[in-house]
Amino acid sequence: MDKITYAYLETTNYCNLDCSFCNRTDVIGSLKHMSLEDWGKLLDGIKHHPIEEAKLMGMGEPMLHPQFDEVCRMFKETFPKCKLIVATNCQYNVNDKFRECMKYIDMLYFSIDGYKESYERDRSPAKWKKLIKFLDQFKSVDRYNCDVVVNYVVNAYNVDDIEKIDTLRKENNLSQLRLNIAQIWDENKSLQDDIATSGYTTEQLDYLKNTWGDNIMGKSKWNYNDCFWVNNAIYTTVEGHVKMCCMNTGAEPFGNLFENSIDEIRQMTDYQNVKKGCQTNKPTSHCKNCSYKELIPILEYVGV
């Protein structure tokens, strides 16, 4: 069996925002913070895998977990050599818990999609003033060598704001601007169903290619048999459910880590069918609207 080297682990599904490209309200169950006891059990269940990179995020704002500093500490205690990545929406005040988290996080994404009006539109009910306050507070935070970057989800309505956010990044001594072309995380919908994810003009695409090509994440040379999720990754929800990837958060889980081992779940028939479908470039219905596959023409155009 292939070893897991990448983990995407959700420890809370609480969130203070309702972002336009997030299907959170359609897929989450009851609001929940994972207990430290369950978190310890989950880590024990996957610690035999050589995980090299992990993201502690999902359908919630990670920093809303009341013990997220302990969550991070426990993870790094279990996987001391693993690169730990966390994304945050910056819509809260920096506190001691946040400062403690910085000791364990290797890369921190500040999610900033758009400038002022477009930011508040796409990340409602986020407030621009609250973001600026957070950035001001962050200036006094010890980063402990954490690489702090800006993660920007690009859509057809915020392309013109990229330069403004890059200026904001520089003003706040953040190391990188990461541009992610917006995706749809729903297996029943396509990028073509939303003008914001498909309605780019040629001028916009040329601008992205010529000005920001080096900042755009992803790769255009990709087919289903290149999918690393089915071979070397794990995606878990706050309940312990195992799903295939973060591109299809609405899918039925293959199993639960608190009921079966991760190795047992990965051997189950439904899991293996999805895996074999990708490996043979004959995807099952699970992957029929893979938003990453749908992105390929755009990524090719912008030269990624």
Model-predicted regions and their roles:
Residues 60, 153, 293:
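Short donor-sugar binding/catalytic loops of nucleotide-sugar-dependent glycosyltransferases
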Residues 16-24, 244-247, 284-294:
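Local cysteine-cluster metal-coordination motifs and their immediate loop/turn environment
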Residues 1-2, 290-304:
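Membrane-proximal basic amphipathic "stem/tether" segments
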Residues 1-21, 51-57, 231-240:
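N-terminal pre-triad scaffold of radical SAM enzymes
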Residues 14-17, 24-27, 36-114:
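Conserved SAM/AdoMet-binding glycine-rich loop
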Residues 2, 280-281:
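Short loop/turn hinge sites at secondary-structure boundaries
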Residues 10, 29-34, 44, 69, ...:
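Radical SAM enzyme [4Fe-4S]-AdoMet core and its adjacent flexible, acidic
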